[in-house]
Amino acid sequence: MAYSYTEKKRIRKNFGKLPQVMDAPYLLSIQVDSYRTFLQDGKSPKNREDIGLQAAFRSVFPIESYSGNAALEFVEYSLGKPEFDVRECILRGSTYAAPMRVKIRLIIKDRETKSIKDVREQEVYMGEIPLMTENGTFVINGTERVIVSQLHRSPGVFFDHDKGKTHSSGKVLYSARIIPYRGSWLDFEFDAKDLVYVRIDRRRKLLATVVLRALGYNNEQILNLFYEKLPVYLDMGSYQIDLVPERLRGEMAQFDITDNEGKVIVEQGKRINARHVRQMEAAGLTKLSVPDEYLYERITAEDITLRDGEVIAANTLLSHEVMVKLAEGGVKQFNILFTNDIDRGSFVADTLRADLTRDREEALVEIYKVMRPGEPPTKEAAENLFNNLFFSSERYDLSPVGRMKFNRRLGRPYEVGTDQKSREVEGILSHEDIIDVLRTLVEIRNGKGEVDDIDHLGNRRVRSVGEMTENQFRVGLVRVERAVKERLSQAETDNLSPQDLINAKPVAAAIKEFFGSSQLSQFMDQNNPLSEITHKRRVSALGPGGLTRERAGFEVRDVHQTHYGRVCPIETPEGPNIGLINSLSVYAKANDFGFLETPYRKVVDGRVTDDVEYLSAIEEVGTVIAQADSAVDKDGNLTEEFVSVRHQGEFVRMPPEKVTHMDVSAQQVVSVAASLIPFLEHDDANRALMGSNMQRQAVPTLRADKPLVGTGMEANVARDSGVCVIANRGGVIEYVDASRIVIRVNEDEMVAGEAGVDIYNLIKYTRSNQNTCINQNVIVNLGDKVARGDILADGPSTDMGELALGQNMRVAFMTWNGYNYEDSILLSERVLQEDRLTSIHIQELSCVARDTKLGAEEITADIPNVGEAALSKLDESGIVYIGAEVTAGDILVGKVTPKGETQLTPEEKLLRAIFGEKAADVKDSSLRVPSGTKGTVIDVQVFTRDGLEKDDRALAIEKAQLDSYRKDLKEEYKIFEEAARERVIRLLKGQESNGGGSTKRGDKLSEDLLSGLELVDLLEIQPADEAIAERLTQIQVFLKEKSAEIDEKFAEKKRKLATGDELTTGVLKVVKVYLAVKRRIQPGDKMAGRHGNKGVVSNILPVEDMPHDANGVPVDIVLNPLGVPSRMNVGQILETHLGMAAKGLGDKIEKMLKEQRTVLELREFLDKIYNKVGGEQEDLDSLTDEEILALAGNLRAGVPLATPVFDGAEESQIKDLLELADISRTGQTVLFDGRTGEQFDRPVTVGYMYMLKLNHLVDDKMHARSTGSYSLVTQQPLGGKAQFGGQRFGEMEVWALEAYGAAYTLQEMLTVKSDDVEGRTRIYKNIVDGNHYMDPGMPESFNVLTKEIRSLGINIELKNGD
């Protein structure tokens, strides 16, 4: 196998046994693909499909005027280039967006003839549309945001029941609901009396037949739709009915049923079963005489006209009187509805009988009254309202997804129409749709069919960025449409252009609102690469059109069988959002309809193929899916007699030939974060949940350290997160320094006519959203060959292209003097000295100079009443130097604000006129370092309002940026010239000269001669061969063009920098100062492993006091062994043992290198590690000796191992590795007390565990209040660090003081220290005067209590006096 640039340097031994059928997909595709399809930017306007933006425009245009004489048509849209790139937008605090222009055609028709009179086409500016960065984020107002995908109920039709909770009888009431993508909901529901009702948009309920009447059906038609008819014959005074034996099955015989000979087949009162049915069929019975009573309560199926013209209406209940009328009226035959109590209920007929509306108009009026209560109904209004509810494509859209789900649920065939017309037709409801839903509901009530499970992932779909932006865009366009319609009638007369008609503000506002303040547009979690990736792969059930925390029940939050391979069962927040916010599984993706799919291998006749098929939860129904680790022989046949499979949501065992699919990978079930936990299969799920969540809070350490025990997913996460620099094309490293890499691209990857230079500028010490530090470090060397996709530089928390969130620590599981009580962690001072858990945090402090009523604020070093020492770190412009070390209270930016003019005496005026004394009328409002902060200034940015003169500092910053850019361009041109020179020498070599340059006519051009000449001289040579001369001219022209292009780029950059910045109104200048703070680990900081084993650092011990082994090697960290059994996360122990083996092997390799063993011996030892102890085999023979030495050098700190989730290392393999590393197979070591040198009683588990430092640092939490703000109502101090609040002295603390009888302390707590307003001012004064005397008064909360009681109507007064 071929190794990449970084893999060669450090191969991770993989214990996985299962073959890799497919690589993990690109992890951000759900975001990137969704937005790409929405914009369709790369496609030409002619080839754009009807999706995304195109669909939004198509659905609103054409817009016609009310008279129909003018119309606006949409032709195409185009996106311009964004003004600034992503980094510039983040610095300037602007939005990364592209201007959108839309070509609109205005058509004006002649009023009389309706022929086209005039056509005008014009491009209209429609505002800016935010662009997605290549890593799936948006930059909105300078901050990176993520749009989280939403998991919502799919449009379609759903059948459900209330589980007997609505009615006191406990009767199960069924209901059906049609949910469109946009428009009114239509619900049908049964009540306890078995009548069917309808609700529109959850309004007051109506009888369902009202809607059927409104659709234009009469009684007979309605009965016809829902029931079969049963003919009744009146013959010689007795009634006969057609006998269909199958229909009678299950009914109770109300009379003896006899055959033609009079032999009884079924006795009265017996239930008719299958045997009786067979006997009746054998007897050949076709008619059955029935007594009159049998027909009582039956229902007439149609109107029956008697002799005398009297009509017995359809849906009449037969009774003795009606039967007599029928007999007298000479009716020989009539139809009744076939109903019974078992599976043919008379629900619709009963509802129809209860319905008081007689015709369509009455029904429409009834619906109008419900929808618009209080408005007087007119015939037209009622008609329009009903039509607009479900039958107008403007107001109602089921969407292709909804139509697919609808037809599928009702068992109809489904083909989706792609063109706009068929989309509109399929988007609205038809009469048949409504009838079919009602019919299905009645059948479910009759006991046929099942209700739906709304938590099934076939009934929930994912709405991603693209779709949500499209919806917002449509909302904006609809607002535009309303305004345009008003103006179009003017356009007919006033000769307006499209530009005059369209006001794009509503569109821009809708988009801005969505990206800026929607619940699903979130501030990106940028703690580390993993937290970024997880945030982008999150699916939330909350948000607009979704659930709310309070309403969501237990079922919605629970793990459902369809989550398998689609949504992670582990990773979800603890707390009120549990189960509502989920994470996509590693291999999951959303299909075109938005349903989540997961890949499976196809299995044919018990043989597993390599064909991979993505199945959604809907398609998975009925399949039989084997586990990824099912036993398979070398030909791919399943070998077990019964294979463990998943079928219909159950785990069962089936023979191999029944199996249809097989899992692709063992990691398929879990999300990215969970798949990074080694030995996840040995951890309790609750702890694994904490582990996945805490990995996202890990702070990038100063030097990233790859995990010794990983899972093999680390490289994928680092690569896909976008924090590393990845080579776009292969080539040779031409130049490299700390902040840039220049690559000369391979010839075969170059596009004709380009320089073949790729320049990568690295991000250095930049602030992330969470104030952690983003910094990239080069890992390539000059002259190295790299291929496309290789990692060139590591980002934060990555090491050689692998995710590295923490540090490998030598841990011992033992108690140590109570310092690890309750999960506390005891650390060694060595960790501190080596800066292993030190992180850099960057704070942004900004100073804004505004234009005030009294004059402009000024940024200056001339500050009144400030000593020389305080200004020592500022330059002439009053801005701090880069590199200055500042502490709390230091001035960063000097700023003065004008004060109100005071009345001056004439003498003062004179003095001021003479000496120009101006200091008195300004006050110091400088930006100072906040309390509790100290650090180094690493960057300063100055933004000046357009039209104001820039100060020296701003100009210096601008110059530095230009110089850096010029350097890039020069580098590019230099490589370009070198490439051209090589090409020219290749062309001229061996040719004959025609003179020119330093050659004479007839000279043979040798390589020695040519290689001594510069490019300019080479291009002057005129070769005899004209074809070559032509090529030389081309190269010359090309170089000129390139030079001009580079000059133009530089000029453009200069123009960008020279223009002022767009600042908010009233702001003249903004100075941003970036402070870097180094945070070492200290007691009170929170740390954790990857298995949910979290704790707080309790103490940092000197190295000499730490427990050590017989060789004197001390441990780094002491953990409490009692934290393991009750929490059931045994994975950490296995990780510790395997980590010990990895480190031991590294030590052995280091020893071999020190002893300068031969490469052959090294090869043999590496072969033992990689290929003898199980797992994936590595091809070490493909590496050269130099590469083997480099590899061994990188393995000295430990051999990195991968134990994939659910397919990891076995106990025996861990023991074998320990043995190979010359460590006891038990993994336990005898330790000695560092203080006394005594041996501890029994061997201790010592090994290497990967420990993370979490972003819960004691520095951010330490807080003390002196005097601060108070709550308005209760007058008590506020709570929390952000409000500068006090410590709450709660109910239980009061009990404690009461128990101690500390009366005065208690009085002080409840009065002057809290809410006794007068008392606290008095005591403050007393303390200032040095008189420590307390005079408590009435607490404000007592007054609040009395007011509260009075508000209940009880008068309460406090009597003062005796």
Swiss-Prot record:
This enzyme catalyses: RNA(n) + a ribonucleoside 5'-triphosphate = RNA(n+1) + diphosphate
| E.C. designation(s) | 2.7.7.6
Q: What NCBIfam families does the annotation carry?
A: PRK00405.1 (NF001616), rpoB (TIGR02013)
Write out the GO MF terms: DNA binding; DNA-directed RNA polymerase activity; ribonucleoside binding
GTP-binding as a keyword of this entry, yes or no, is no
Q: How does it assemble?
A: The RNAP catalytic core consists of 2 alpha, 1 beta, 1 beta' and 1 omega subunit. When a sigma factor is associated with the core the holoenzyme is formed, which can initiate transcription.
Biological process (GO), any one = DNA-templated transcription
Protein's organism:
Acinetobacter baumannii (strain SDF)
- Tell me the protein's name: DNA-directed RNA polymerase subunit beta
Which UniProt key words apply to this protein? Answer: DNA-directed RNA polymerase, Nucleotidyltransferase, Transcription, Transferase
What CDD domains does the record point to? RNA_pol_B_RPB2
Question: Which gene is annotated as encoding this protein in its UniProt record?
Answer: rpoB
